Amino acid sequence: RSIDDIAKIHRITIWYQRGAKMDKHTEKSVHGGDVYRNQVELDFSVNINPFGMPDGVKKALGDAIFLCTQYPDEKVSKLSEAMAKKLDVPQECILFGNGASELFVAIIHARKPKTVLVLAPSFSGYEHSAACEDCQVCYYYLKKEDNFELTEHFVQELIRQIKAHEAPDLIFLANPNNPTGVCISFDIISQIVFLCCEHRITLVIDECFIEFTKRQNESLIKTAIHSQYLIVVRAFTKIYGIPGVRLGYLAASEKMVECLKRQLPEWNVSLLAQYAGAAALQEDEFVQKTSEYVEKQREYLTEKLRLLGLTVWQGEADYLLFYSEKNLYEMLLKKKMLIRDCSNYKGLESGYYRIAVKKQEENDRLIAALEEVLSDENIK
């Protein structure tokens, strides 16, 4: 197919920023989970599995404690073998890191792009990694009228940039996106993959939350191992509830993996992480149970929030983005509940909040607290 076969060309504006320096959107705490500076009983600001860590992973971590006098396996052999079997891909096409964030940085160091394209709003870690090579970061702004979905418009703009020799060297996309929870349609993402591979644009797909959705069969891992320009990144953090362990992985061609491996320090995956990861891969039933439960609770929370008069965006992950004119962050913090203030996300503003989908009783406590603070505000 030629470029013109894909779509007609329409121009839109993309805002460019030299480098990825911190501005008003990133100078605040750029992640949720700020429990170290706040007295919190319920933390809805981090998108972790509502069931927490699987028992099998807890046991593996307990057993591994007694082995920590040893160095970890530098080749991550057992975990790599188990992952290759689970994904049905060659072991040489998988690379583990100290969380997905380390892998994003390694990708930037290896590819050395001059220009990097990210969506707005999206995970700030992409900008952070781009700053390691002082790349020019450009943003494609998603529209709330489109439910923050990536539409055909993006494909058309990418085509225009390719024809004008203005295309970025590297693109970060998240599927589903964070903080919106919105997934990219398979048709759109397929067109983007085709364009990037055809025109030598490195495409990094962040699938860290895909296991919470019903779109696991749309993963691009199997595609990535046959491409020189596609990389898929995932993490154990969210689905297995182990952010403190730090374990992420990517799938790419063998040649790409070898290139990326050279950017990582030796022993970057701890012994604890390797044992936890191997145990986690045995938890298929746990993942399935989580996905089903999260879907029901997400729908439940969406309905309850809308009944309170809040604007909620329809996502597919284990979190929800909503809007209120009230300062809900401070109001709920007084009740020892922490939600994610999304005003420091580029493309969002004051009034946008993200909450994790948790267990029924915790979700009910949040709704009750919101009813109370909103009722008090209305009385005033």
Locate each region found by the language model.
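Short loop-beta-helix segment that forms the pyridoxal 5′-phosphate
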Residues: 72, 84-106
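Conserved PLP-anchoring active-site segment centered on the Schiff-base-forming lysine
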Residues: 110-131
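Active-site phosphate-binding strand-loop segment of PLP-dependent enzymes
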Residues: 144-214
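PLP-dependent aminotransferase class I/II
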Residues: 53-54, 229-312
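N-terminal "arm"/small-domain region of PLP-dependent enzymes with the aminotransferase-like
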Residues: 15-70, 166-167
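Short, Lys/Arg-enriched N-terminal segments with co-localized hydrophobic residues
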Residues: 1-21
